[in-house]
Amino acid sequence: MKMETFLVCLFHNADGLHQQIQEILYLLRMHIYETNLYLKQELSRLIYPNRQLSFVLLMPLSLLRNWDDIEYLTDVVDDKQTLHYAANLLTNYVLHLSMFQKLTKPYFLLAVKRVSEKLNKKQRHSFYEVLVTSETLNNYENLSKNILNTLMFAVRYVFKPTPNYSEILAELEKKNKIHHIIFNMVITDFAQIREQQMDKHLCETNNELRQECKETIFDLKVVGNV
């Protein structure tokens, strides 16, 4: 998946942002050839007053340039709403990069940890609280695999200290049974995931849901092995 395609998909429901997105994509392509200072000036012009866009810029900018500007873009945003938005958006982005471009874990972990640390330090909200909020799940209700992959990624690689799994599971169970089932499996070792376990958990569900579960577990294994 191309970066341009993914960014546009993220904002398919955002009115009035199309032109800004096109400008951003143009600048990102220029960034390969231009200096960081020039790009900073141009990006600053675009991200205000809508500072949520700063994190759309943070992701590809950091990936293109060895993370030089990551603190600049994270430190300009302090409000809780934008940080929550950024944490979810950023995690989904790096997950897609890991699957489609085969990036190594240390390379994309830094950005997620940076946002997570900022959340914990300034807002006193842990990363998992962001991921299990109703707003986050509702925003991605039609992208169930993205949600599940995000949760798996956060648990396997980001959480420090270890989160309270029971709280996460309880929150997920309220919202969507399939999310709860998959997540419960994910926090165990992948070797323990067997078809008979799925049958036990999904004995009251239909075949279509069972197939979705199998496909999702396959996706999770792929991401987990990046």
UniProtKB/Swiss-Prot annotation:
Q: Which UniProt keywords apply?
A: Glycoprotein, Host-virus interaction, Inhibition of host NF-kappa-B by virus, Signal
Inducing factors: Expressed in the intermediate phase of the viral replicative cycle (immediately after DNA replication).
Signal sequence range:
1-16
Glycosylation (residues): N142, N164
Q: Which residues form a coiled coil?
A: none
Q: Does the keyword Disulfide bond apply?
A: no
Q: Name one GO biological process term.
A: symbiont-mediated suppression of host NF-kappaB cascade
Its biological function?
Answer: Plays a role in the inhibition of host NF-kappa-B and IRF3 signaling pathways. Mechanistically, promotes the degradation of host IKBKG through enhancing its ubiquitination leading to inhibition of both pathways.
Q: Which family does it belong to?
A: Belongs to the asfivirus I226R family.
Q: Please report the name of this protein according to its UniProt entry.
A: Late protein I226R
Annotated organism of origin: African swine fever virus (isolate Tick/South Africa/Pretoriuskop Pr4/1996) (ASFV)
